[in-house]
C-alpha cells in the first residue's frame, strides 16, 4: 500500500507540473483550427498594409539570413514550420517552440543554409531574428501569446532566453531600416508584431510549382 501511495504521489506531482500546458488555450490559425505541432504555416501581418514573414539579405549578407516582414501586402512570405518538443498534436499558448523556414523555399536563393530561427545579440538594430549559423545566437525558445479576444485569432511572438524567468522574455517587434525600409524582426520593448497564421497546403503548392516549371 505504501508503495502504491508513493507511486500515486509521484504521478500526481509529475502530471501537475505539466498542467499549465495541458489546460492552455490552443493557438488557432486564421480559419479557427488549432496549429499542428510540426505543421507549416504562413505567418501573416494582422493588417493588410504589409506581407508575411520571410528571409532576406541585409547589410553585407550574401545569403538571406535576416528574418523580415515583407513590405508587399500580396506576399505571404515563406512557410514556417512550428514545432514544440512536447509530444503533442496541437500547439498551445506558452509552449516552447522552434521555428524554421521550409528549406525548399530558400534553397534556390542560397544552398545549404540552416533555416531555423534564432536570436542574435550585439547587432546595431538590437537582438535580431536570424537564420543560419551564428556564434552570437542566444540559447532559448519562442512561444506564442494571444493579443486579442476577438474572432481574428491575433498573436504575438515572444522569445525567452534559456533558463530565464518570464520577465526576461521579450516580444518580437519590428526594426525599420531608415535607408531602405527593411522591416527586421527583433526582440523589442516597443509594440509587438501582431500576426496570424495560415496553414500552407504543401500538396497544392507543389502542384503549382510543378505547373510553373513546365510552363517555363
Curated annotation (Swiss-Prot):
Cystine bridges: 63-110, 160-169
The protein's UniProt keywords, in alphabetical order, are: Disulfide bond, Protease inhibitor, Serine protease inhibitor, Signal
**Pfam families for the chain:** Kunitz_legume (PF00197)
Gene Ontology molecular function terms on file: serine-type endopeptidase inhibitor activity
Q: What PROSITE patterns has UniProt attached to this entry?
A: SOYBEAN_KUNITZ (PS00283)
According to UniProt, residues marked as the site described as Reactive bond for trypsin are 87-88
Give the propeptide positions: 206-216
Matching Gene3D superfamilies: 2.80.10.50
User: Quick one: signal sequence residues?
Assistant: 1-24
Family membership, please give it.
Belongs to the protease inhibitor I3 (leguminous Kunitz-type inhibitor) family.
Write out the function statement from the record: Inhibition of trypsin.
What else is on record for this protein? The sequence of variant A is shown. Electrophoresis identifies three genetically distinct variants, A, B, and C, that are inherited as codominant alleles.
Q: What is this protein called?
A: Trypsin inhibitor A
Specify the species.
Glycine max (Soybean)
Q: What is the lineage of its organism?
A: Eukaryota, Viridiplantae, Streptophyta, Embryophyta, Tracheophyta
* Gene this protein is translated from: KTI3
Amino acid at each position: 500500500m505504501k508503495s502504491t501511495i508513493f507511486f500515486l504521489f509521484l504521478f500526481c506531482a509529475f502530471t501537475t507540473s505539466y498542467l499549465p500546458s495541458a489546460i492552455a488555450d490552443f493557438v488557432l490559425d486564421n480559419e479557427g483550427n488549432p496549429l499542428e505541432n510540426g505543421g507549416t504555416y504562413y505567418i501573416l501581418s494582422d493588417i493588410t498594409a504589409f506581407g508575411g514573414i520571410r528571409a532576406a539579405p541585409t547589410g553585407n549578407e550574401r545569403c538571406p539570413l535576416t528574418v523580415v516582414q515583407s513590405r508587399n501586402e500580396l506576399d505571404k512570405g515563406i512557410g514556417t514550420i512550428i514545432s514544440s518538443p512536447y509530444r503533442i498534436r496541437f500547439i498551445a499558448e506558452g509552449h516552447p517552440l522552434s521555428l524554421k523556414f521550409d528549406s525548399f523555399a530558400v534553397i534556390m536563393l542560397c544552398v545549404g543554409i540552416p533555416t531555423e530561427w534564432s536570436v542574435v545579440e550585439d547587432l546595431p538594430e538590437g537582438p535580431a531574428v536570424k537564420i543560419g549559423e551564428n556564434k552570437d545566437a542566444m540559447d532559448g525558445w519562442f512561444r506564442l501569446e494571444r493579443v486579442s479576444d476577438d474572432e481574428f485569432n491575433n498573436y504575438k511572438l515572444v522569445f525567452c532566453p534559456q533558463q530565464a524567468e518570464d520577465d526576461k522574455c521579450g516580444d518580437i517587434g519590428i526594426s525599420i531600416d531608415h535607408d531602405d525600409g527593411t522591416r527586421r524582426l527583433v526582440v523589442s520593448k516597443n509594440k509587438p508584431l501582431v500576426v496570424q497564421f495560415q496553414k500552407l497546403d504543401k500538396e497544392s503548392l507543389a502542384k503549382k510549382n510543378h505547373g510553373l516549371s513546365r510552363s517555363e
